[in-house]
Amino acid sequence: MKFFVFALVLALMISMISADSHEKRHHGYRRKFHEKHHSHREFPFYGDYGSNYLYDN
């Protein structure tokens, strides 16, 4: 389970890093669009990298 969470966080970080170049072009539109359609309940580690989510398991 820990490996799965680690891989998911790593993939999320890679996707965020690759989106940085596009984010400058779109002035942060992609990030606002993402936050509007995905709640923190769906991705509990998105906001603070899951200080609560990782330790609860």
Curated annotation (Swiss-Prot):
Sorted keywords for this record are: Antibiotic, Antimicrobial, Biomineralization, Endoplasmic reticulum, Fungicide, Membrane, Mitochondrion, Phosphoprotein, Secreted, Signal, Sulfation
Question: What are its GO biological-process terms?
Answer: biomineral tissue development; defense response to bacterium; defense response to fungus; killing of cells of another organism; positive regulation of cell-cell adhesion; positive regulation of metabolic process; positive regulation of substrate adhesion-dependent cell spreading; positive regulation of vascular wound healing
Query: Any signal peptide, and if so, which residues?
Result: 1-19
Choose one Gene Ontology CC annotation of this protein and give it: endoplasmic reticulum membrane
Positions carrying Phosphoserine are 21
Q: Where in this protein does the record say Sulfotyrosine is found?
A: 46, 49, 53, 55
Q: Cite the domain annotation text.
A: The wound healing domain in C-terminus may promote cell migration and proliferation.
* Family, similarity comment: Belongs to the histatin/statherin family.
Give the function comment from the record: Histatins (Hsts) are cationic and histidine-rich secreted peptides mainly synthesized by saliva glands of humans and higher primates. Hsts are considered to be major precursors of the protective proteinaceous structure on tooth surfaces (enamel pellicle). Hsts can be divided into two major groups according to their biological functions: antimicrobial Hsts (e.g. Hst 5/HTN3) and cell-activating Hsts (e.g. Hst 1/HTN1 and Hst 2/HTN1). Hst 1/HTN1 and Hst 2/HTN1 act in different cell types (epithelium, fibroblasts and endothelium) in oral and non-oral mucosa.
- What remark does the entry add? The recommended nomenclature of salivary peptides follows published guidelines. In agreement with the authors, it has been decided to indicate the boundaries of the peptides according to the positions within the precursor, and not in the mature protein, as has formerly been proposed. Histatin 1, histatin 3 and histatin 5 constitute more than 80% of the total histatin concentration.
- Name of the protein in its database record: Histatin-1
